Amino acid sequence: MNLVEVGLEEASYPIIIEASSLSSTGEVIRKRIGRKRGVVITDETVDELYGSDLDDSLRNEGMKIDKLVVEPGEGSKSLDVAGRLYQELAELNLHRDSVVLAFGGGVVGDLAGFVGSTFLRGLPVIQVPTTLLAQVDSSVGGKTAINLARGKNLVGTFHQPEIVLIDPVVLETLSSADVRSGLGEVLKYGLIWDENFFWKTVESLELFEEVGDPEELEASVSRCCEIKAEVVGRDELDKGLRQILNFGHTIGHGIEAGSGYGELKHGEAVIWGMIGELWISLNRGYLTDETFDQILGALTRLSLPALPDDLTNARLLEYIHRDKKVRDGVINCVLIKEPGEDIDVERVGDTELKGAWEFLRSLEVSQG
């Protein structure tokens, strides 16, 4: 077992990473939190695979549990689905000592976290992530959100979980696209914080792709959580240092929005976004050709998915300008000067973004 503490001024909490720990979820909740009433929010896929394991674990510890199930996919991160969940929660007569368990990937974690943070002015939330992306990134840090037609994560809250419970073994049922999506975030941590971890991950991609040695997988997931916990602990509300976690997300969110939130997984779009923002760093003279080529070679080993056919340069810029990170019309990107060491958030102009997009298009042709 690995334990990572997220140290915040008012809402510190543990992340527990342990292989084959899903069946002990109820025991951990009883010992650490002591809640007796709760509701599990999950999706159809996760419920079919692991729902009974979680249900048994919770009920064996005397918890009264209800379950709300949504359709899998980014489409569930919507006002309509959130509204339905509010109505269903109200019918359950929950009280403020009840707990919401977000049991699923990033979509479920964001959606359940948002609904839990706003229903009855805020219920305690426990994150039980089941995808690589959710385990290493979205379940930690307290950001919750739903999407609007005009952009991703435009409605959301900061609501730290009571605890994050991670069982890396459940990753064995992920699709290759979901693994690749999560690996985008894993590699991001290496590039912004720990270059040695980046190259170690590149050298052992099969550990994630084949869900290999549980101890090694546990250690890698733990390292990601340690990095995010340190960053969030120093900047909980995303006003400074935490912005480096958005590496690849400015361009990536534009690509994801342009694909209609479905053609590409979030992490896949972020991989493309990281390459685009690395190209801007290269174009500004921050990275040498050698360093850029080495990192590019590593990222393209992930068998990148196709970019949306109908996403033009103009439409990409339109989506990027709608992004919630824009301030006073200024677009910022995370630019890498020295991997793992020297990272800055800097203003980026439309001309540079167009150049990055043209590079991505040319790279797609050369790759495929």
Task: Please report, for each region that a protein language model flagged, where it lies by residue.
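A glycine/threonine-rich phosphate-anchoring loop and its flanking beta-alpha core
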Residues: 16, 114-207
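Generic secondary-structure signature for well-ordered alpha-helical cores
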Residues: 59, 91-94, 160-163, 169-176, ...
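C-terminal charged capping/lid subdomain of soluble metabolic enzymes
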Residues: 2, 184-186, 286-368
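ATP/NTP phosphate-donor binding region
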Residues: 1-98
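Short glycine/serine/threonine-rich phosphate/pyrophosphate-binding segments
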Residues: 107-114, 135-136, 253-254
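Residue-level signal for inorganic ion chemistry
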Residues: 18, 40, 78, 129, ...
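Active-site segments that bind and position negatively charged phosphate/pyrophosphate groups
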Residues: 203-314
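Solvent-exposed alpha-helices and their adjacent loops that cap or buttress functional pockets
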Residues: 7, 32-33, 93-95, 118-120, ...
